[in-house]
Amino acid sequence: MAKIKIKQTGSPIRRPESQKKILVGLGLNKMHKVVELEDTPEVRGAIAKIPHLVEVVD
């Protein structure tokens, strides 16, 4: 299966708890951290919920 790289670009400070949990679920906990995950509909959905906090890196 294809991989996707995600970089945290925004701070979770002053964000709703649900958005913080999505970041933790994606494995992101520090600014500018990059993780590589399987490209699944679940991961794409999580990214779609917090586009202001993450960016997809090629």
From Swiss-Prot:
Any single biological process term in GO: translation
Chain segments annotated as transmembrane: none
InterPro entries found in the cross-reference section: Ribo_uL30_ferredoxin-like_sf (IPR036919), Ribosomal_uL30_bac-type (IPR005996), Ribosomal_uL30_ferredoxin-like (IPR016082)
Keyword terms, alphabetized: Ribonucleoprotein, Ribosomal protein
Domain of life: Bacteria
Ribonucleoprotein found in the keyword field: yes
GO cellular component: cytosolic large ribosomal subunit
Pfam families: Ribosomal_L30
GO molecular function: structural constituent of ribosome
Signal peptide per UniProt: none
Oligomeric form and interacting partners: Part of the 50S ribosomal subunit.
Family per record: Belongs to the universal ribosomal protein uL30 family.
PANTHER family: LARGE RIBOSOMAL SUBUNIT PROTEIN UL30M, MITOCHONDRIAL RIBOSOMAL PROTEIN L30
Descriptive protein name: Large ribosomal subunit protein uL30
Originating species: Erythrobacter litoralis (strain HTCC2594)
Lineage: Bacteria, Pseudomonadati, Pseudomonadota, Alphaproteobacteria, Sphingomonadales
Gene behind the chain: rpmD
